[in-house]
UniProtKB/Swiss-Prot annotation:
Organism: Chlorobium phaeobacteroides (strain DSM 266 / SMG 266 / 2430)
CDD domains assigned to the protein according to its UniProt record, in alphabetical order: PPAT (cd02163)
Gene symbol of the encoding locus: coaD
GO terms for cellular component: cytoplasm
Main location: cytoplasm
Name of the protein in question: Phosphopantetheine adenylyltransferase
Family matches, as InterPro entries: Cyt_trans-like (IPR004821), PPAT (IPR001980), Rossmann-like_a/b/a_fold (IPR014729)
Keyword Methyltransferase: no
HAMAP family listed in its UniProt record: PPAT_bact
Cofactor(s) it depends on: Mg(2+)
Length: 167
């Protein structure tokens, strides 16, 4: 039986920190499904389809990686549906862990067969968050060291589109 995990997140945008956690997960699991959460309460820069395209382009050469969208519903139910035995979460700081720990307990209650695996990214990514990447890029800063080249191109294109629509 293959060891399958899901790696959920908003991924707006997908950063090198996310990629690092995914790479670490692939050292543990045979299959990892990156699951893009679609949350109507969260204002995102990229649409869910743009994030799907972005991540698919990045992981195309990673055997054992698939990408999907969770439009609605509980993550624990989705994990059960795809027969994943683990939920991978990247944890950069204690603050991240407190929230993720609560969620892991809830997911375990809803789907007792699932385990949450907390992975710390490489230290060079501990301060990299999608929200920071968006803000730095919007203010004209260089984020090329923190995102894949395809993400950088999509960021520049999206920011140009937003600039045109706001003028």
């Amino acid at each position: 039986m293959k060891r399958k995990a899901i790696y959920p997140g908003t991924f707006d945008p997908f950063t090198n920190g996310h990629l690092d956690v995914l790479d670490r997960a692939l050292n543990i699991f045979d299959e990892v499904e990156v699951v893009i959460g679609e949350n109507s309460q969260k204002k995102t820069l990229f649409t869910v389809n743009e994030r799907l395209e972005m991540i698919r382009e990045i992981v195309i050469e990673f055997p054992g990686v698939t990408v999907a969208v969770l439009h609605d519903g509980l993550l624990a139910n989705y994990a059960r549906q795809v027969e994943a035995r683990a939920i991978v979460r990247g944890v950069r700081q204690v603050k991240d862990f407190e929230y993720e720990f609560q969620m892991s307990l809830l997911n375990r209650h809803l789907y007792p067969e699932v385990t949450t695996v907390f992975l710390m990214p490489n230290v060079k990514y501990t301060y990299v968050a999608s929200s920071i990447i968006r803000e730095v890029a919007m203010l004209g800063g260089d984020v090329s060291k923190f995102v894949h080249p395809c993400v950088l191109a999509m960021l520049h294109k999206k920011l140009q589109e937003n600039k045109k629509s706001n003028s």
